[in-house]
Amino acid sequence: MATYKVTLIDAEGTTTTIDCPDDTYILDAAEEAGLDLPYSCRAGACSTCAGKLVTGTIDQSDQSFLDDDQVEAGYVLTCVAYPTSDVTIETHKEEDLY
């Protein structure tokens, strides 16, 4: 099992870096680290937890909400995203999807 550095940039521009194992969803790791990120369904079926991937790679094959264009644009649902490298994600991006 690998552990990656996940850097989260919130709506105010505050940057927090956490450790996230490759078998743990980014949202879950953030909560364990004491961060308060938006979420609703926790199943990849809505957009409440949406973020934007700045650098790195993730596996969000469990998500069912984002369309191909949104995925290609870098949007990520943190509730069903596993890191596959060190990543930087801008959080609180639900409004940008619409």
From Swiss-Prot:
Keyword field contains Transport: yes
Tagged with keyword Transport: yes
Keywords associated with the record: 2Fe-2S, Electron transport, Iron, Iron-sulfur, Metal-binding, Transport
Binding-site residues, [2Fe-2S] cluster: C41, C46, C49, C79
UniProt GO MF annotations: 2 iron, 2 sulfur cluster binding; electron transfer activity; metal ion binding
Domain 2Fe-2S ferredoxin-type: start-end pairs: 4-95
A biological process from GO: electron transport chain
Co-factor(s): [2Fe-2S] cluster
Cofactor comment text: Binds 1 [2Fe-2S] cluster.
InterPro entries per UniProt: 2Fe-2S_ferredoxin-like_sf, 2Fe-2S_ferredoxin-type, 2Fe2S_fd_BS, Beta-grasp_dom_sf, Fd_pln
Similarity annotation: Belongs to the 2Fe2S plant-type ferredoxin family.
Protein function: Ferredoxins are iron-sulfur proteins that transfer electrons in a wide variety of metabolic reactions.
Listed NCBIfam families: fdx_plant
Protein name, entry field: Ferredoxin-1
Native source species: Aphanizomenon flos-aquae
